[in-house]
């Protein structure tokens, strides 16, 4: 059985929860051959892997969403070749732009015409007519030129992805909807294979939250972008044979966005709790500090600035508190610098940015961990903290509430939940956690029992073994438990 993982903007280029999950999944099934379709912004990412690839990951195909000679409204081109749509192609393209029910097979086939130029199509007469009709129907109160260029910007990366010759596999496993779901749906159309969608966060909601806060897009144009991401997710839900999510509320959101409930299966995350046993603790010198740890990527979605400001307030009451921010800071260097500058401007002491580290070297030395994200799914960092007997302070996003309070499991609270971006509330939680050692230990043990009861890697592996074998059986494929053997890793474009 050959499984093609389709991932956008994460594995194997960026360290994080989803990347770690993909790496763990592939390594959990040495009997399956995996290939990877990795979607990234541009060629600057080419081959820059931060993970050592498993032996059963045999090929990596890279898709660059900005891989074209295009500048907004100022493209240098020798000539414009007209791309003429058939009546059927025109109708389905119009349906897609108008967010109506669309025969996507026609769209997929269109972009696999030989020599079809995305640039020429977007600059051509047919796309102009489609944009004009959409404008006249729904957006005639705004400037048409701005609307037209917005549509071109929206569809450029999607159309570029649709030109990809997707490698053949028995199962396409997309680790999100969005562009991953588009490619997975197209692969199913051309190869007749099965399609599995696994959402960690709800892609549409995450993009919507980003767009609402974004300064580069304003007014009605935010809604136009949001509708585009909804459309892409709906396509993935419609074409998928199965859709998984991490917790019950995520299932509700998927259904709200149009996913048929009979397709959805809740599959919680799982970690190897044994690797986090017997971690090194504090040295005698380190015991003078109360250590608060944050395992994260230094990016805006993790809201590190709120964490730093909350720590500055908390440290006024707990003088021996120390904040350890553990994780890479190179994904958004501008934001990382703003965080460093914030620490300096606040004049706060004892904030350590470690960069990328082996969490096992640090986690045992923490008294509690901290997560101030504005969006999450089911954070692996919380599960890892629990496996190390550490309580957690987390914002009320994603599945954090259930991870901290449980779902009537009888284990009790494993930390403190706060509102997002609430500096005072987070600071108070840090003080409370720091001064109550007995409560810290009780919460840490509750988390340890919870993670071992519901979130172990062997449990997750068994669920996905059942899912993968089910797809294999339905396609009459051979299934063996023997490790897949390959001698050469080949990276292809």
What are these regions (language model features)?
Residues 336-356:
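Nucleotide-activated donor-binding/catalytic signature segment of Leloir-type glycosyltransferases, i.e.
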